[in-house]
Swiss-Prot record:
Protein name as annotated: Signal recognition particle subunit SRP54
Gene designation: srp54
The protein's enzyme class: hydrolase
PROSITE patterns the record matches: SRP54
Catalytic activity as recorded in UniProt: GTP + H2O = GDP + phosphate + H(+)
Function: Component of the signal recognition particle (SRP) complex, a ribonucleoprotein complex that mediates the cotranslational targeting of secretory and membrane proteins to the endoplasmic reticulum (ER). As part of the SRP complex, associates with the SRP receptor (SR) component srpra to target secretory proteins to the endoplasmic reticulum membrane. Binds to the signal sequence of presecretory proteins when they emerge from the ribosomes. Displays basal GTPase activity, and stimulates reciprocal GTPase activation of the SR subunit SRPRA.
A Pfam family of this chain: SRP54
Broad class of the protein's primary localization: nucleus
Binding site for GTP: 108-115, 190-194, 248-251
EC id: 3.6.5.4
Amino acid sequence: MVLADLGRKITSALRSLSNATIINEEVLNAMLKEVCAALLEADVNIKLVKQLRENVKAAIDLEEMASGLNKRRMIQHAVFKELVKLVDPGVKAWTPTKGKNNVIMFVGLQGSGKTTTCSKLAYYFQRKGWKTCLICADTFRAGAFDQLKQNATKARIPFYGSYTEMDPVIIAAEGVEKFKSENFEIIIVDTSGRHKQEDSLFEEMLQVSNAVQPDNIVYVMDASIGQACEAQAKAFKDKVDVASVIVTKLDGHAKGGGALSAVAATKSPIIFIGTGEHIDDFEPFKTQPFISKLLGMGDIEGLIDKVNELKLDDNEELIDKLKHGQFTLRDMYEQFQNIMKMGPFGQIMGMIPGFGTDFMSKGNEQESMARLKKLMTIMDSMNDQELDNKDGAKLFSKQPNRIQRVARGSGVATRDVQELLTQYTKFAQMVKKMGGIKGLFKGGDMSKNVNPSQMAKLNQQMAKMMDPRVLHHMGGMAGLQSMMRQFQQGAAGNMKGMMGFNNM
């Protein structure tokens, strides 16, 4: 049972409260039984599950609860709070300092995905604007340097290693010295792993640690071993000063929940989780947003961060066009490019309230990305006049031979080009409405700048554009309005970043 299954089962248990006519002790116990069964199936320690049940029962006294209170809401809140506590070690994680050398040393057993995770972390910080690099001090595993070199080259990250030097301490020290002199901000050192916790592994880790004096030692943990993670993490913490943990392979193993709760029990903060084999299948781990996404409640904060990463406010030309209600096919193409930059599509969908981690299966995700690429391929066959026309759809309707030319050039049927133009027309209509709303692009809190009735009209326009199935998963019109309110308050001025995204 992967994490998506765990989320679905807990959500189903909580939903049973909504179906119950009267909320009494029997209904509460039945719901808790389902939640606990799901957690045990995910390999969460039985003592932790028992504690969660007792804490919820202690927090909810149905007999003493005032009649005016929403019992369902109170119970759901109590369960949510206890699930957060289950994966929260209660320890603040180390964070790097911008503008100075931050040395991060990776440790872990062989096969945990340590080398790949080094590259993922370097790439993550590189995308955030940090100067990052990689050092391969793994001289034990054949091909370790080749793997790191390949990953680093693909992501355009500077790296250091040696095919001739066999002493990992020398390689690590030389690499750190080199990159410090070049003012790199994130210096990641990959060390040797073993098949088991050998004394020689710990001795080597200590030597490398003493040589490079890391600011943070990260232990990489394989989620597939479940609650056995606790013993492993403690063994490493006893030998070296492990400050953070990254849990890998959470995308396809039944024991992910057990692994996360076990690590939290060691009081080691989990800083990231690996959710796939690709370099951007990597997410910062924050307890509340994680549980929120798991239960299909979304992560607006994470979505805002993704949109802010695109630095859309810097694109003054686009903002000026949006203010005047103008939107060309080239603008739509650029918005599709922005969606591609935001990371794995399933990861983004999971941040929207109403979409659990199981809504977007790998097959659906690939299908959506393929569709997006197909639309971009069609636009690649258009000329400048077509892409930059203020009403591109009208130009094509007046001269249908253009549709045939674009279809031939992109290798698609004419109906595919027509579908793209229909999509574009919907976007252009919404932008026209946005351009007529005063205060939308003013900056600051949009909820204060924008007339509520105008905002409601815009929400209705967006609802018309959306697939009915998508709108249903968001909780209908009320769910869409709630999400937009959160987005307005948290990402003032960045609403145009949602362009194109809402209809995918």
